[in-house]
Amino acid sequence: MIPDVSQALAWLEKHPQALKGIQRGLERETLRVNADGTLATTGHPEALGSALTHKWITTDFAEALLEFITPVDGDIEHMLTFMRDLHRYTARNMGDERMWPLSMPCYIAEGQDIELAQYGTSNTGRFKTLYREGLKNRYGALMQTISGVHYNFSLPMAFWQAKCGDISGADAKEKISAGYFRVIRNYYRFGWVIPYLFGASPAICSSFLQGKPTSLPFEKTECGMYYLPYATSLRLSDLGYTNKSQSNLGITFNDLYEYVAGLKQAIKTPSEEYAKIGIEKDGKRLQINSNVLQIENELYAPIRPKRVTRSGESPSDALLRGGIEYIEVRSLDINPFSPIGVDEQQVRFLDLFMVWCALADAPEMSSKELACTRVNWNRVILEGRKPDLTLGIGCETAQFPLPQVGKDLFRDLKRVAQTLDSINGGEAYQKVCDELVACFDNPDLTFSARILRSMIDTGIGGTGKAFAEAYRNLLREEPLEILREEDFVAEREASERRQQEMEAADTEPFAVWLEKHA
């Protein structure tokens, strides 16, 4: 089932320096909660400055949904320490509140009013809040409070030059973009390994079903928790953050221009379903527009091609201008066993897997095959640890035992690990391979199995509160290592100044500005 990458691995072993200079970054979301686990109703902590313009700490959907962002970094340890500093400072500056350590929220009542993230009075800030109003009206606020970790990854130019020859200009844009689309296609085919190993949302609180019927065979504990005994990541299931209305868009990952055209079409395609919501009611705007996507960011995807945007530029226009610059992996649940929601083992595994995805052959993928890959993902998401689980290839009927496929993949990853260790020194990547491959013979070692044992004992709420309290105490006591207190104060002041400048520079009324951007 795994493509034959022996030639590509032999090539890599002859060109180890092609992997010197991998760049990566992390984003981690987490809900602010009270000591009893209920959602915090306070505004964004003052010490964290402006959520609109702060470089490292912002908000996602809700005012209580923090998002931490590291700068691009070539050093894993430095990046994780930077992320930990962001958590340390925040833990010391959020009063008695804690950071919820799980992807799935709990203690949110059905119909509870969840305050949308607020970004001030600039047109850009009001647009961001209106976009969230649209998300709430389309999908419900509860779904938008699910948290995850995003891992951003780019291969060094040395890799592309070793692989594609001496490239520059338009030629580089085309070839590098084609290389990253290969990564994306392989990710759709084999990325289910991420929720298998690291999925950590095998259960949900009863409030999450919101009284809706479900065909999933949930088991229920006495405290009202619903779980699937072999599930890995309900966050990635249809119960979590997915968008059924997007499944017919036909966006593919074979070619830069084809992908961008599909994305641009989606933000122009009217939706009958969303038209029923209306655009405005009683003088209040309900969504940016009633198209399938309000803006490009609404496209749900487990992985995205990205380029840093310039001021006023859409993500797709940035891709057209310069091609794909990096990949955003979006399938990681919050790691409940880490105070910062992600750890070194996961980052090193993702490095290995992304390199493998760049090496393995990846035939073009039709929208039909893309839909077929979802079958494997759903199996792993809902019953990944089931003893006799099998997976298929695309739309073919042949089936293969998941443990065997996993071990075959890790045989390749071990060779990538040897190459990365040869240029970085030590055996850190090989150690990760040895630790994780054991999960295929013993699923009890996976994150989902480990966290489910705790949840069955103490419930999602009890588990979440215990971790949140322990991490709050730990982070508040730890000294900062990379950033200093004055760095945070300076960024708070600078972010507030940037927001004020944006607000002062706006001359058009929001309604007029919106007509040009909706």
Curated annotation (Swiss-Prot):
Name the protein family: Belongs to the glutamate--cysteine ligase type 1 family. Type 1 subfamily.
Q: Which HAMAP family does the annotation name?
A: Glu_cys_ligase
Q: Output this protein's name.
A: Glutamate--cysteine ligase
**InterPro entries documented for this protein:** Gln_synth/guanido_kin_cat_dom, Glu_cys_ligase, Glut_cys_ligase
Fetch the PANTHER family from UniProt: GLUTAMATE--CYSTEINE LIGASE
**Species, as recorded:** Escherichia coli O17:K52:H18 (strain UMN026 / ExPEC)
Q: Does the keyword Nucleotide-binding apply?
A: yes
Pathway the protein acts in = Sulfur metabolism; glutathione biosynthesis; glutathione from L-cysteine and L-glutamate: step 1/2
The alphabetical list of record keywords is: ATP-binding, Glutathione biosynthesis, Ligase, Nucleotide-binding
GO annotations under biological process? Answer: glutathione biosynthetic process
- Extract one GO cellular component term from the record: cytosol
Which reaction is this enzyme known to catalyze? L-cysteine + L-glutamate + ATP = gamma-L-glutamyl-L-cysteine + ADP + phosphate + H(+)
Q: Which GO terms describe its molecular function?
A: ATP binding; glutamate-cysteine ligase activity; metal ion binding
Annotated EC: 6.3.2.2
One Pfam family, please name it. Glu_cys_ligase
Is Endoplasmic reticulum among this UniProt entry's keywords? no
